[in-house]
Amino acid sequence: MLFSCTFQLQAQEYVQQTDLPTIYIETEGGRPIVSKEDYVDAVLHYVDSNGVKTYDALGVRGRGNSTWNLDKKPYRIKFAEKQEFMGPERAKAKSWTLLANFADKTLLRNAVAACIGDFAGQPFTAGAQFVDLILNGTYLGNYQLSDQMEVRKKRVDIDEQDEIPTEGANITGGYFLEVDGFGAAEPVHYKTKRNVLVTVKSPDEEVIIPRQIEYIKNHMQLFEDALFSSDFADPEKGYRPYVDSLTLASLVYFNRVDR
């Protein structure tokens, strides 16, 4: 996807509104962002104590499930070229998110969970940089700049399967799955016996084959069955052979913190 932003911008001064960085987004022709599927061409100005940095080839669209229906909208940014948008310590990538945190009146839960994840040594936790967001001249408030959840170095760093497997190929992974109550609209999803909706984020629908989907279903079902069995705590008969216990415990804890 190539974003072309040759439209004329009105001259204005881009200033840092508070001690936080300020992000100015100006869409082509001032078009509103009303879709979670269609990107709107835009220019972005990132202002902090180091000055103004301008990105002139990107698109912006909505994101989220239930959060997209709230008054303060979350957004996804996609640059034409990969950017170290949150610095060299994080991913170099095209896609980034602006979280509104509208349902959290402290605005802190997602960021605190990310900090705890870093402290606990989780393999990956999303970035958390608070910013002020101004869209087409209107101040929208405090947002959290963060990573897009995807398979990539310094994000979900697993072996990506980007080709259709050949007959007899090893299909044990890696796989990027999400437990998603709103995932019924996702192209690859299924439910466990306990009605847990699971979506497959990677591999993409274009390359994943039925044999891989069955492998995922079977592995996850074995885990669920063991977790809810009377032997769940047994190191051999319980859930532990199917999952890394420490990262699972961390995930459960972070989900509690993030509510």
Model-derived regions: residue spans:
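Phosphate/dinucleotide-binding and metal-coordinating scaffold of catalytic cores
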Residues: 11-259
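Bacterial Sec-dependent N-terminal signal peptides
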Residues: 1-12
